[in-house]
Amino acid sequence: MPKRTDIKSILILGAGPIVIGQACEFDYSGAQACKALREEGYRVILVNSNPATIMTDPAMADATYIEPIKWATVAKIIEKERPDALLPTMGGQTALNCALDLERHGVLEKFGVEMIGANADTIDKAEDRSRFDKAMKDIGLACPRSGIAHSMEEAYGVLEQVGFPCIIRPSFTMGGTGGGIAYNREEFEEICARGLDLSPTNELLIDESLIGWKEYEMEVVRDKKDNCIIVCSIENFDPMGVHTGDSITVAPAQTLTDKEYQIMRNASLAVLREIGVETGGSNVQFGICPNTGRMVVIEMNPRVSRSSALASKATGFPIAKIAAKLAVGYTLDELQNDITGGRTPASFEPAIDYVVTKIPRFAFEKFPKADARLTTQMKSVGEVMAIGRTFQESVQKALRGLEVGATGFDPKLDLNDPEADSILKRELTVPSAERVWYVADAFRAGKSVEEVFELTRIDEWFLVQIEDLVKDEEKVKTLGLSSIDRELMYKLKRKGFSDARLAKLLGVTEKNLRSHRHKLKVLPVYKRVDTCAAEFATDTAYMYSTYEEECEANPSSREKIMILGGGPNRIGQGIEFDYCCVHAALAMREDGYETIMVNCNPETVSTDYDTSDRLYFEPVTLEDVLEIVRVEQPKGVIVQYGGQTPLKLCRALEEAGVPIIGTSPDAIDRAEDRERFQQMVQRLNLRQPANATARSEDEALAASKAIGYPLVVRPSYVLGGRAMEIVYQEEELKRYMREAVQVSNDSPVLLDHFLNCAIEVDIDAVCDGEIVVIGAIMQHIEQAGVHSGDSACSLPPYSLPQHIQDEIREQVKKMALELGVVGLMNVQMAVQGEDIFVIEVNPRASRTVPFVSKCVGESLAKVAARVMAGKTLAEVGFTQEIIPPFFSVKEAVFPFAKFPGVDPILGPEMKSTGEVMGVGDSFAEAFAKAQLGASEILPTAGCAFISVREDDKPFAAQVAGDLVALGFEVVATAGTARVIEAAGLPVRRVNKVTEGRPHVVDMIKNDEVTLIINTTEGRQSIADSYSIRRNALQHKICCTTTIAGGQAICEALKFGPEKTVRRLQDLHAGIKA
């Protein structure tokens, strides 16, 4: 069946902001779908609220709406654009749920829109647990024993059939949100209550526990003619009980017999047919009991998922692209496989002659109160993938690509510790982010494979592989560097040992080890990912390293630019940096360079095989980058675009003679090194908050007397504000110095005077060494003290006087020229009245670059890449700051709901995982839309609770006045209430949590409050009001922890409900006019 001609335009729903369980893999799939459908001549309309994505670039679709993915908003877009079809399978759970809402509210029927790729009934059958269970029974497949509950009463009924331990999962949520494992009645009650609340249909599935079973996934693609292929089988290294997004996974499956594999393959095809997935990709998850071999179907996703992004990168088969084409009527045998240059059709199942390992990346250091144990609710924020010829090689490459300080299986445990044995038992039995290292420690401690298997239930095949690596390490420890000959070195490198790990074992430097290895002529070769196990030739340069005879890299002699990516997503370094890397690659390719991308994150667009000319899927570490440079000999390497990951390498790369283009490593150091930066600020006669550096507790206490409290304290060289705190008195400073000095490895702790009530400003600029052009000035809505990545911001500024803005522009230009910036630069400043303070300067791509590019209609990342490659800003044609005639607001999205016990308060340490953007003619409209996009539902009436710190009291009356005028009842604690009463406004007093009951938390629990404005100062007041914020989160009450946030909410409420939707392309045309 060739493509359908009865549909002309297709609406694609994106996934919205990045949250735990739904990361940038949906930018990758959405961008692919846009490309594939436009290639076929369809008009593509895209909705996505996340500005940091490639898919929302104006060139990706015919009409782009950066609007909230809520059915009412999408209905307005459908009314305006009149698409013929809706493709809901590219935007994760968000898009599926929105599509079902549109169907339920009759919007699709009203405007005659057909759902393609999956229909409402299919989605419902796969997602609705009781229908899914029944469907599996109909085709003779077993599901875990289970029951459905819509209330606590029903839940107890199911419990009687299933027994403890049991697994609880809410329907229509993703990443296992709200679910968990219950071992007793108390836990059962808590998890069920949370799950019923979080499921949009108030429905729970309660399953028998399969903990310790082996878990597998099949990635399947099916077309209209019932052709099916398995793209990839994936095996979870961690057994059942850990969410598959948090498990280490390996492809292809390693421990299945051929017979088992065929049974599972047939079962997964039967599942797709029964559920009714006519076209596109799905993944089916299975559990197998290691003792009896009983196989059960756990679940299936009738959409492109995180696993399909992994399967696409693992095999080179572009699932999302193929799925989009199947949705418009093609069949698999009609589509070509790009990687083999069309030598094979898409109906050939990929064959792979290597092993892929994925390891998740967690961010528990950001949430010290969170439970770091892994269960059925997903907690990881990113992942890294590695390719090797064996499991040993690929797992060791993945471990070093994670960037958690490991160079391989580094020991975690001091084996001489008297507690060592009990720590080991606990760490092996209860899975955590670090379990895989403890497995290696268990073998060092002399445990047998059988013992470790009993504790972990990790398949013995994997355990034997790790035990073998530990034995190799023990052997290396007994040798000296000179006694390692070519044969042994070759054997160790084939098993994936990194230079850094071997150097540590031998007690030499990594540099010494590398030169010894080069002397022995032990060098990696590069193999291609070609979907066909080298059976057909391939023109696509998608490479991984290994130690063998034949190298398939075949580098060209063209001028090349190499871009280092950002590695795994984490809080503080996410999709924004990937966006910059992709734009750099596009710009360099347009200018005739051959582009080389180095990255190891399988979720991203940067690791797509056609984003750059050559892709090296390798860890972004010194060893791996230097080897690629040796083979490719690039003209220039870009390190400023991937966040802190490549920046950390720039000094060492420069020493090794790698040509780093753009801002010099020395200039980067001048901006990052505190003392050198201070000298520059003084030379330019600019102002910084009073500050000092301290290397010990005594120095810190002395400095604090000179500077005065409150203080911001932090270690030097960090991204995302790790281990940063605001302290208000000496006791807090002492405690911080005892806990934080370990973070700094001999580098000092920095103390800054904290600017209370200051307005924070973010500036992005581009410089070519001669002239500086401001990309944008953004005013933060939260005052200084909230990390810039967590603060909402407005472009253009909404209340910053013009003369202050002009002064900021001048100061930024001075600093850019003084530092000799070539490329992008980001500056953070604070404004207190007429005083402007420089807080920090980052001569690199910042996380606001994508947002700014969407607002001003010019890709700063592309402009800056061209400047780095040697053009002037005049030659690029970007010489004038663009100030848009509309307002854009960026709002951050947080993962607090996933971490019970974590305080949802904003401070100097970054906690957000993603962002959304709202656009309006006024600041109020843009802010209101951004809140909606972030799923913060602003209340329109009810009772507002206000309790603010001393410094905010002058503003409390104004906010209260606004709320009263909008029809709210205002309640406040005693001190705040006095201020409001003094202004002649009606207010009801309520007890603080420490003042006896009934107090404010009782009101929150009884759902008597609809809006909370609660600002704090100092450790004690934060601790006292913790239960207010946590309960507000659990009861889904709009809550802000800054007075400026309260003022902005009042502005948005005055604006009233959102009325218009705007096309990005029209907004940009309006700027150019």
From Swiss-Prot:
The UniProt annotation places Mg(2+) 4 binding at 840, 842
Residues annotated to bind Mg(2+) 1: 285, 299
Domain ATP-grasp, residue spans: 133-328, 678-869
Domain of life per record:
Bacteria
Annotated spans, Allosteric domain:
936-1073
UniProt domain MGS-like: residue ranges: 936-1073
In this chain, the stretch annotated as Oligomerization domain covers: 404-553
Instruction: Extract the ranges annotated as region (Carboxyphosphate synthetic domain).
Output: 2-403
EC number of this enzyme: 6.3.4.16, 6.3.5.5
Tell me the residue numbers annotated for binding Mn(2+) 2.
Answer: 299, 301
Give GO cellular component annotations, separated by semicolons.
cytoplasm
Needed co-factor(s): Mg(2+); Mn(2+)
Q: Where is this region: Carbamoyl phosphate synthetic domain?
A: 554-935
Residues the record lists as binding Mg(2+) 2? 299, 301
Q: Belongs to which family? A: Belongs to the CarB family.
- Name listed for the protein in its UniProt record: Carbamoyl phosphate synthase large chain
